[in-house]
Every structure is written in structure tokens, then in C-alpha cells.
Amino acid sequence: EDINYQLAQNDDKTAIFEGWCDFLNYFDASIRFQFSFLNLYGGHDAMEQSILVPLRGDAFDEIRAEYSGMLKTQLAKGNNGLKKTRYITFGIEADSYRVAKQRLERIELDILHNFKQLGVAAAPLSGKDRLRLMHAIFRMGSSEEAFRFDWKLLPATGLSTKNFIAPSSFEFRNGRWFRMGKRFGAVSFLSILAPELNDRMLADFLDIQSSLIVSMHIQSIDQNEAIKAIKRKITDLDRMKIEEQKKAVRSGYDMDIIPSDLATYGGEAKSLLKELQSRNERMFLVTFLIVNTGETKQQLENDAFQAAGIAQKYN
């Protein structure tokens, strides 16, 4: 889907973008959700096994073997074993476990249906799948320690699931970086200063050839509360505009000359209010985080510097 979007004509890109806008507008203020984009080294051998086409002992085995060989060749000269996956995590608050379970199941079905409408293949993760994923995240894809887990082991050993996924150690002595097992890591947040962000920014982050995690924590704001908040902001801006005009009159220059920031922010706020009221758009609070990791501090610094350059380019 990423490749389809990048190669599409502008009209098709607009249609895809609007489809994703509709997808996001499904989430009301009661649902908290997060997109996670993972670039992890999954182990070359495991990836090679996953792409092989099994032989079936018929006349087409020669074609299957040739196709498998072609895939192995592409893998060898492709992404250096970097496995890219995407996840959506969502949660709600409820008065009881039963109510929460029923609603989460309904939301899950709706999300899967909405993904299908977008042409995106998606599948839910089981409890063991989630543990396997967290095990990989804590090691950033390193295959040094295999994931070994069975639910039957919990009552027999007295251990919890944390014992099966936790790395050998955590270290948070430094304010700029941390250690997770043998790897160094750093978390950066994106301050969104531009009025619009280019649709290439996320793709460029994920094109960094190293283990990283990009996450977007998203909270929809209640429609009425969002409209009230924007109206209060417009009122504040109008009040500041009046104060600036009074200063201009007292200083003897044209009262229509006001700071450009006031004019810009006022126009953007009114445009946002119009979209919320007339186009049924939603307002979201977004926290954009990037986790860079490296086997050495120098590698970590290099990757973090590259990510900062991308943020500066588009923001």
C-alpha cells in the first residue's frame, strides 16, 4: 500500500488520503489509539524461511524453486534484513470487564472492516503474538535470544509473562539515552510547528536503515469541546488584535498593521472552526515519538541526527 500511494497520480493520492481521513474520523473521544511503525532486524534466516514457496511434488516445483531463488536474491540485496511492520493499538474505559470486552470486540470488527475498505490487510494479535512482539521490541529484533513461551509454564513455574519478554537489563542513568540489554536507545518527540506536514515525512523516517520505532499516540477530542476550544482561541486572538490596534493608535501609526503571527493564527483558527462545523471533521491531540537504537553510542547519535534532519526538512 505504501508503494501504491507513492506511485499513484495526484487524484488517486487525494482519494487514498480522504479514505484515511474517514478511517480516523471513526474514532470518537472515548477511544484512545496509537499507530506504531516498527523497523526491526528480524534475523536473516527467519526472513528467508518466511518468503520461501514450499514445494508440492508436482510439475510446478521447478517454477516454485525459481521464484524462491529470485525472492532470496532480492532479500540479499534489499533491506539488509530489516523487517517493517505496522500496528494499531486501541483502548477504552468501561465500568466492568464484561462491558469493556464486548465493546472492544465490536471496535475491533469495525476497524478490520474499515481497513478492508481501504484495501489494507490486517489481522488481530493473540496474547502470545503480543508477547512475541514485545520480546522483539525489547531486543530491537536481535536474534541472540529466541522467544520461548507457553501459557502452561506460568502456573508450573510461578513466573509472570514479564519474565519471558524482559531484556537482561534496563539502564536509565543518562537523560539523553538509555540502555536496553546490549543496545543503546533514545526517544525523541516531534514538535509540529508547520501548518501542514508533507505526506513524505513518515515514509522518510521509515526509510532510515536501522532499528527504530515511530509511534503516534492519538486522542480524539469531543466535537463540542473542540469547537468551544477553537472559539475561545479565536476570542483570545481577537482580544490580542484589539490591544495591538490600541497600541497602534496611541503610537500614531496605522491600526490595520498588526503582527503577522496574529493574522496567520487567526486565519488558521477560523479555517479549523469551519472544518469542524461544516465538514464534520474531528480534532485530535497527537504525540509523535521516534525511538532510535544502536549497538554503540556513536551509531545511536548518527541515527538520531538523521531523524532530526528529516524532521527539520518537513517541519
Q: What would you call each of these model-derived segments?
A:
Residues E1-N315:
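Extended, folded cores of ATP/NTP-driven motor/assembly subunits in large transport
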